[in-house]
Amino acid sequence: MTIHTDTRPTLNLIRLAHGRGLDLPAYETKGAAGMDLRAAIEDGTTLTLAPGKRALVPSGFIFEIPEGFEAQIRPRSGLAFKNGITCLNSPGTVDSDYRGEVKVLLINHGDEPFEITRGMRIAQVVIAPVTQVRVAEITEVSDTARGAGGFGSTGV
């Protein structure tokens, strides 16, 4: 008999009052990297995002991210492709020691106003490991084939 133990880290969360009735963040497919976040705006209202404008949209949840991890807030590709709606500061980092509500900073790069309603999937969150490094000041760096070649230096 094989016993399977789930060794994945746990994302603890608190549902806020305005998040009641919303689905928990969830992976929509077996191979999904990100869990969908939903808009926790007041039921029966619409948040209209005009072209070129931005809005901070509440998720209705406080995350307790495991130590050694971060939550990356990323755009949903369908919203970006179909409507020009994306996340600013993407990916947005939510540190493991942050204890406030997770909110999504959206911008409308499209040509038409975009209506956000309660429960709409507005972004995705990826939980990723973080490595903190030691910092050392040195006087020169080692040589590489690339050298100091920057933007576009390896071809188009």
Curated annotation (Swiss-Prot):
- Xref: SUPFAM superfamilies: dUTPase-like (SSF51283)
The answer to whether UniProt assigns keyword Cell wall biogenesis/degradation to this entry is no
User: Keyword set for this entry?
Assistant: Hydrolase, Magnesium, Metal-binding, Nucleotide metabolism
**Binding residues for substrate:** 76-78, 89, 93-95, 103
Q: Which Pfam family would be a valid example here? A: dUTPase
The reactions it catalyses are: dUTP + H2O = dUMP + diphosphate + H(+)
Biological process (GO) annotations held by this record are:
dUMP biosynthetic process; dUTP catabolic process
This protein's cofactor list reads: Mg(2+)
Pathway where it operates: Pyrimidine metabolism; dUMP biosynthesis; dUMP from dCTP (dUTP route): step 2/2
* Known EC number: 3.6.1.23
Write down the CDD domains for this protein, in alphabetical order.
trimeric_dUTPase
What's one GO MF term for it? Answer: dUTP diphosphatase activity
Tell me its family.
Belongs to the dUTPase family.
What this chain does, per the entry, is described as:
This enzyme is involved in nucleotide metabolism: it produces dUMP, the immediate precursor of thymidine nucleotides and it decreases the intracellular concentration of dUTP so that uracil cannot be incorporated into DNA.
PANTHER family under this entry? DEOXYURIDINE 5'-TRIPHOSPHATE NUCLEOTIDOHYDROLASE
This chain belongs to which protein, by name? Answer: Deoxyuridine 5'-triphosphate nucleotidohydrolase
